[in-house]
A protein has these predicted regions:
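Short, flexible loop/turn segments with low-complexity composition
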Residues: 85-86, 194-201
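Short beta-strand(s) of the beta-wing in winged-helix/HTH DNA-binding folds
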Residues: 53-56, 147, 193
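Conserved beta-strand edge residues that scaffold enzyme active sites
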Residues: 32-33, 180, 200
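GST-like domain detector, emphasizing the conserved glutathione-binding G-site
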Residues: 1-123, 127
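GST-like fold's C-terminal all-alpha helical module
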Residues: 73, 89, 97-190
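Generic structural signal for helix capping and beta-alpha/helix-loop junctions
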Residues: 35-37, 183, 203
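Carbohydrate-binding/catalytic loop surfaces
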Residues: 119, 201-203
Length: 203
């Protein structure tokens, strides 16, 4: 398998999952501005959406969209604990939190990366995102180590990836001590550190 990524972008999530699952894979860096991969290939030929992540299987098929990719990877190693078994209620709970991260939290960060955003729009976007972070803080409160309880899952890889963007867009995550502790806890995992180093995000 080959994972197409851009350092620090949302492809970090499946990168972490690949390592946590112990699956064989390679990575190929992609420039999202030029839509060229580090080997000089046209990235649109891999993913016509032009976004990362994209996972190219050994048979040439390509899967895109982070939540779909991480569940596919978890299902390749069902005993890893990275996702509840398909068809169980717990699996639908995992899908619920993945959907929340992608449609509310990830989406909430996106406009803040726009350098042309107006002051009023930025203030509104920050306020809206703050409400999502409030909910996550409450959801993780009460001593939960991870989103699904005591077990690290693909949802944690995704939320960790998104929370890493906070300082880059002017969000002081210290306002949410539960989320700060959570991000630190996930970030200390050996495979998370390995992914960060591979993408040039840590020494």
């Amino acid at each position: 398998m080959k994972l197409f990524y851009s350092p620090g972008a949302c492809a970090l999530s499946p990168h972490i999952v690949l390592l946590e699952a112990g699956l064989p894979f390679t990575i190929e860096k992609t420039d999202l501005r030029t839509k060229k991969t580090e080997t000089g290939s046209d990235y649109y030929a891999v993913n016509s959406k032009g976004t990362v992540p994209a996972l190219q299987l050994d048979d040439g098929r390509v899967l895109t969209e982070g939540p779909a990719i991480v569940q596919y990877l978890a299902d390749q190693k069902p005993d890893s604990g990275l996702a509840p078994r398909a068809g169980t209620f717990e699996r639908y709970q995992l899908m619920e939190i993945l959907n929340y991260i992608t449609s509310e939290v990830h989406k909430g960060y996106s406009p803040l990366f726009n350098p042309k955003i107006s002051a009023d729009w930025k203030a509104s976007a920050l306020a809206n995102l703050g409400k999502k972070l409030d909910w996550l803080s409450g959801f993780l409160g009460g001593g939960k180590a991870f989103l699904m309880g005591t077990t690290f899952t693909v949802a944690d890889a995704y939320l960790y990836t998104v929370l890493r963007w906070s300082e880059h867009v002017g969000i002081d995550l210290e306002k949410w001590p539960v989320l700060t502790a959570y991000r630190s806890r996930v970030g200390q995992r050996p495979k998370v550190q390995e992914a960060l180093k591979a993408e040039g995000l840590a020494k």
